[in-house]
């Protein structure tokens, strides 16, 4: 039995990630899915929304809430999809939503689970990427020498 972790910072291109998982995972393997859910608007969206301030604060607040709701719905939908995939392929699934980006908790889980590999879906958007500390995560993973597969909105990094 092999153990892997999938960390989702982006919900773009999830069908491609599932294709990759189908090739990689075998029956009785275990997949830990950690889906990062936004609790507030990413800095990029915050900047764009503030530029339309003429709409009024209520509209800005509604737009911010809509963006967060869509991102949270995407996270929940993918976790349901991951359950279906686990059922059809007969691998064990452990999933949780991360309500607030906390790199230290992720590091502890990666160490604790003694993983055989990790899959991460980052965003191609540099503002979101900077917000989730992409470079810090990559540097840390290189130090612990854990095999990793990196995606950007579902596209495999070369």
Language-model features and meaning:
Residues 2-61:
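Small/aliphatic-rich secondary-structure junction motif
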Residues 10-14, 99-103, 124-125:
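Short beta->alpha connector loops
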Residues 16-21, 105-109, 136:
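A short acidic, amphipathic alpha-helical/loop segment
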Residues 32-34, 94-98, 149-152:
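General small-molecule cofactor/ligand-binding pocket signal
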Residues 57-74:
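A short acidic, glycine-rich active-site loop
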Residues 73-85, 89:
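Ordered, amphipathic secondary-structure segments that act as subunit-interaction surfaces
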Residues 84-117:
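Structural beta-alpha unit
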Residues 110-158:
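Gly/Ser-rich helix-loop-strand patches that form or flank binding pockets
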């Amino acid at each position: 039995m092999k153990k892997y972790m999938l960390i989702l910072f982006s919900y773009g291109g999830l069908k491609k990630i599932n294709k990759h998982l189908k090739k990689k995972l075998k029956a009785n393997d275990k997949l830990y899915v950690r889906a990062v859910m936004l609790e507030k608007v990413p800095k990029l969206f915050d900047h764009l929304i503030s530029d339309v301030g003429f709409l009024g604060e209520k509209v800005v607040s509604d737009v911010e809430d809509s963006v967060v709701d869509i991102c949270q719905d995407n996270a929940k939908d993918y976790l349901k999809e991951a359950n279906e995939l686990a059922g059809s392929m007969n691998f064990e699934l452990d999933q949780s939503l991360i309500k607030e980006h906390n790199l230290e908790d992720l590091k502890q889980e990666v160490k604790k689970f003694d993983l055989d590999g990790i899959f991460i879906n980052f965003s191609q958007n540099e503002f979101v990427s900077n917000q989730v500390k992409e470079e810090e995560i990559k540097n840390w993973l290189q130090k612990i020498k854990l095999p990793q597969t990196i995606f950007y909105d579902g596209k495999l990094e070369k």
